[in-house]
């Protein structure tokens, strides 16, 4: 079963366009962007600007990739509450994880509201991630091409707006199993991670495909999800390549049509 977001998070606005030198009035679909807060134990941990869709998946994926939980069962409940112009996503953790997060907060220098949440030092920004070197997984080159194409075809929000990022999980045997979209590339990947975990999909036997460049955080989040192959339409950063190499992740970038470039663990790709 394909797990696809069907929540529309865009509006139509008036605009004036210039077409071949001639102005014309009309409408354009633009994505919504609202503040989304994640609260644990009644305290706000982070605030992101995000698309207001798939917030349960977002909460699970964010909690996982930021190291707040290590498995889905460590979240007892999630409630999404409207708060002014945005949403407060209230996450109820098990006692052990709640205690660990409180201890982590006591050492934080100040409030956080960005991609690297709860980070106290430069060393933590380049954090240790799971080593997937031993994961026995291989895919064909045409699977990489198919994964990116399937993601592009399934991006309903981007088709309307041409303004959002997408992240998808592709299994060579079953096709595209999950796709999530957001105005932020990190958010899209967190939402995908949550969708995969909530659906009970094994991340080890597939490909994470994204429509953005490959920064180090995208590699870190993919490693924590447990997927050994990450593919993108844009180029990677040097640190992303180094991190993927250490984590045993096959990093494929610049996927355009049937062309792509492999930067790490090329042995997993059957050409």
Swiss-Prot record:
It is found in: Cytoplasm. InterPro entries: Cytidine_deaminase-like (IPR016193), FdhD (IPR003786). One of its GO terms (molecular function) is sulfur carrier activity. Pfam families: FdhD-NarQ. SUPFAM superfamilies: Cytidine deaminase-like. This is Sulfur carrier protein FdhD. GO terms for cellular component: cytoplasm. It comes from the Bacteria. Belongs to the FdhD family. Required for formate dehydrogenase (FDH) activity. Acts as a sulfur carrier protein that transfers sulfur from IscS to the molybdenum cofactor prior to its insertion into FDH. Disulfide bonds: none annotated. GO terms for biological process: Mo-molybdopterin cofactor biosynthetic process. Transmembrane segments: none annotated. The active site is at residue 114. The keyword ATP-binding does not apply. Keywords: Cytoplasm, Molybdenum cofactor biosynthesis.
């Amino acid at each position: 079963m394909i797990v696809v977001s069907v929540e529309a998070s865009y509006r139509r606005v008036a605009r004036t366009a210039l077409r071949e030198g001639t102005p014309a009035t009309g409408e354009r679909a633009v994505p919504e962007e609202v503040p989304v807060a994640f609260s644990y134990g009644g305290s706000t941990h982070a605030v992101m600007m995000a698309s207001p869709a798939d917030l349960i998946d977002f909460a699970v994926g964010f909690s996982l990739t930021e190291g707040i939980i290590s498995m889905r069962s460590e979240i007892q409940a999630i409630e999404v509450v409207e708060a002014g112009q945005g949403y407060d996503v209230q996450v109820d953790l098990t006692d052990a994880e709640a205690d660990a997060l409180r201890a982590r907060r006591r050492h934080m220098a100040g409030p956080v509201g960005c991609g690297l949440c709860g980070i106290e030092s430069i060393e933590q920004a380049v954090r240790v991630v799971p080593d997937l070197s031993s994961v026995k997984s291989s895919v064909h080159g045409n699977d990489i091409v198919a994964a990116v194409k399937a993601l592009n075809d399934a991006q309903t929000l981007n088709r309307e707006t041409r303004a959002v990022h997408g992240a998808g999980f592709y299994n060579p045997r079953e096709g595209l199993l999950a796709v999530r979209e957001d105005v932020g590339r990190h958010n899209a990947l967190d939402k995908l991670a949550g969708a995969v975990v909530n659906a009970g999909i094994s991340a080890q036997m597939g490909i994470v495909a994204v429509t953005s460049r490959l920064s180090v955080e995208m590699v870190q989040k993919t490693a924590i999800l447990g997927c050994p192959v990450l593919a993108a339409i844009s180029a990677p950063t040097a640190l992303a390549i180094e991190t993927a190499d250490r984590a045993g992740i096959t990093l494929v970038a610049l996927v355009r049509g049937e062309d792509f470039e492999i930067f790490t663990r090329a042995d997993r790709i059957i050409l």
